Regions:
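ATP-dependent small-molecule kinase phosphotransfer cores
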Residues: 31-88, 92-99, 103
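Conserved lysine of the Walker
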Residues: 18
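Post-Walker A alpha-helix
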Residues: 21-22
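P-loop (Walker A) phosphate-binding loop of NTP-binding proteins
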Residues: 13, 25
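A glycine- and Lys/Arg-enriched "phosphate-lid" helix/loop adjacent to the NTP-binding pocket
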Residues: 52-57, 99-153
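Well-ordered beta-strand positions
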Residues: 31, 109, 159-160
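Small-molecule kinase domains that catalyze NTP-dependent phosphoryl transfer to phosphate-bearing small molecules
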Residues: 69-70, 126-181
Length: 188
């Protein structure tokens, strides 16, 4: 466990393309922690189907019962367990989570990924993960739920922004460029 561990939080609306940054980071030797996995695991422990509604309710319930930074607190030990000295955290949702990560990791930086609602809906619709929306109404409800926990604030406060409206290869190249800038700044 090194106090010098670089931790990069990735924030973005569902379907924005956070996984592009995560995959680029993985190829660059980062350990990976996915915050949504913690919520999906909790839903499974409660015996709930991993639908968008159930996963969303579990996310809100965890924050209500354990505080706004509940999921970040649950992920911190997983970050420390990673053998890599640089770790990407996929799915930061609020400034409370950002502050929680900063308490544990002095080298914590945020990368936001942005894409239009139409692009995001299409990506989620065709990805077909169990908690992805099946129609526009469910997509819109999920967006509002995510924004209600402070996702927009976390996006606004990110140090780096990747706009993901182009081809996948362009987004991958942008992600690598951003991660190199982060490393240049934080891993001297």
């Amino acid at each position: 466990m090194s106090a010098d561990k670089l931790v990069v939080g990735v924030v973005g609306m569902p379907g924005a393309g956070k996984s592009v940054v995560v995959n680029a980071a993985k190829a660059m030797g980062y350990g990976i922690v996915v915050m949504g996995d913690e919520v999906r695991e909790e839903a499974k422990r409660k015996g709930l189907e991993p639908t968008p509604e159930n996963v969303g309710l579990v996310m809100l319930d965890l924050r209500r019962l354990e505080g706004e930074a509940a999921i970040a607190k649950r992920c911190i030990p997983k970050i420390w367990e990673k053998p890599e000295n640089k770790v990407i955290v996929d799915g930061v949702r609020s400034l409370a989570e950002v502050e929680e990560f900063k308490k544990s990791f002095p080298k914590f930086v945020m990368v936001a990924v942005h894409a239009s609602p139409e692009a995001r809906f299409n990506r989620l619709f065709y990805r077909r993960r169990s908690d992805d929306p099946k129609d526009w109404q469910i997509f819109h409800e999920r967006d509002l739920r995510e924004l209600s926990v402070g996702l927009g604030n976390a996006i606004a406060m990110a140090e780096y922004m990747l706009v993901n409206e182009e081809r996948l290869d362009v987004a991958k190249r942008k992600a690598v460029e951003i991660l190199r800038k982060v490393e240049e700044k934080w891993m001297r």
